[in-house]
Structures are given as C-alpha cells and as structure tokens.
C-alpha cells in the first residue's frame, strides 16, 4: 500500500534527521515529517516508534517540586533535564541524587540552596531552610550528560516543594543565576528554543538579559511559545509558580 511505503520512508528520513540534530544547527531541526491525504486533506505526522508518543515535557500540571529545564549537557548537545523534589521534617539538609561525581553540577545546586538560605524571606515568609530537609533527583532525560546550569532550576524546585505550589503547565526554565542572583543569559537561544518545542514546552521562562537575542530566532518558532520574562531570581520563582 502506497501510504505504508510513504510512512516507512518518512520514518527512515526522520531517523537520519535525529542523528543530524546531534550535530546542531537550525537547518536540521526545521523539517516537517508529515504528509497530506489528497482525498481528505488531512495532515498526518510521522514519528519514529522508538521515541514513543509522549513528549518529554508533559501536558497538565506537574507535582510541586517538579521542574523541567533545557540547556547544554556535558556532551555539548542541548537537551531536557527534569528535577523532582521531596521535603521532609529535618534540620536544613540538602541531598541530591542523579549527579554522580559531577562537580560543576553539584556547585550549581549548592549555589541555589545558599541563595535560598540568604534570600528565602524575600520569596515567602513560610520558607524554612532550618526545620526541613530537601532532596532533589536530577534526571538527564536524553542521555547527553548532566548540565551545569542547575542553580535557577534548583531554586525554583526548592521553592515549589516548600510552598506546595506546582510550576505552570508545559514550562521550560531557561537561564541561570550566580550566587549573588545575577542573571546569566541563554547561549544559542534559537537552538535551545527548538529543543523546547520538540520536547513539548509551550511556555518559556526566559531572563530579560536574553531579550536582545530573540532577533536570531525564526518567527515561526517564536510564535510557538508564550515567553515569560524574569528580571531577578525571585521574579523567576514567582512567575514559574504562577504567582503575580
């Protein structure tokens, strides 16, 4: 059957594209794998079975403490990372799993906890870093090597679990903060946004320092998102949790 042959052909081409995506470059992302039925005018999208049907960043509201971030991993490739958090009665301990011996990643998560201890009262008077213990599990969803851009996602995850508030749905957290709260803009913004789109993100939390780079992003890609700018670490937390 002609349709079956077409689907197999598109599957094979899609696999080639997935390999080329690992080399980077917008030209490998901007490819439509669909066909239109001339009788019904219905468009059918073709994916590859091994990728599954679900998006890495799911629809709907996540659990408090669950955060998705998109950035460059240790291998140099851009991918999606998931943080899942727990809060227990305790005395202010912060444990992390999933980071192994990655020193840069651990330092970034330490930065977040230190920032929360110093500035938590500016976010909420109910945040406690002395009477609770926190555990965050970090997951490299695409096996590209853990990112070191984890301070801001960790801060948001800690505040989310501490306040019992989930992040807004289909949100990808972009950008990073230093120990002083200085915002660090997103490198290679167009490619990062393309990965966000491929992964199911519909809302993008973006530092205002990256606003000037939006000119490098194709209009079609920009139109796929609700861009939410933040101008400080605290502002990023409020907007990630949907608090005005």
Language model regions located:
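Peripheral, non-AAA+ core regions of ATP-driven protein-machinery
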Residues: 36-244
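Short, non-transmembrane amphipathic alpha-helical segments
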Residues: 8-24, 116
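The conserved phosphate-sensing helix
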Residues: 5-9, 42
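Amphipathic, interface-forming alpha-helical segments with heptad-repeat character
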Residues: 1-3
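A short amphipathic beta-strand at an alpha->beta junction
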Residues: 17-35, 133-136
């Amino acid at each position: 059957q002609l349709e079956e042959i077409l689907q197999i052909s598109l599957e094979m081409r899609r696999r080639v594209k997935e390999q080329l995506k690992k080399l980077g470059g917008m030209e490998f992302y901007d490819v439509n794998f669909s066909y239109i039925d001339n009788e019904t005018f219905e468009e059918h999208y073709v994916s590859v079975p091994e990728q599954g049907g679900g998006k890495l960043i799911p629809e709907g509201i996540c659990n408090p403490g669950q955060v998705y971030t998109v950035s460059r991993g240790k291998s140099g490739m851009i991918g999606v990372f998931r943080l899942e958090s727990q809060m227990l009665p305790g005395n202010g301990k912060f444990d992390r799993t999933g980071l192994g011996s990655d020193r840069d990643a651990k330092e970034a998560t330490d930065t977040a906890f230190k920032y929360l201890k110093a500035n938590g009262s500016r976010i909420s008077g109910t945040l406690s870093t002395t009477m609770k213990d926190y555990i965050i599990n970090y997951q490299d969803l695409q096996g590209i090597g853990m990112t070191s851009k984890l301070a801001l996602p960790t801060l948001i995850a800690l505040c989310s679990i501490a306040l019992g508030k989930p992040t807004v749905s289909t949100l990808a957290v972009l950008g990073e903060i230093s120990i002083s709260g200085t915002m660090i803009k997103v490198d290679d913004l167009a490619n990062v946004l393309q990965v966000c789109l491929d992964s199911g993100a519909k809302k993008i939390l973006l530092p205002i320092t990256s606003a000037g780079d939006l000119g490098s992003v194709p209009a079609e890609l920009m139109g796929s998102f609700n861009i939410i700018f933040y101008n400080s670490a605290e502002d990023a937390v409020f907007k990630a949790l949907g608090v005005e």
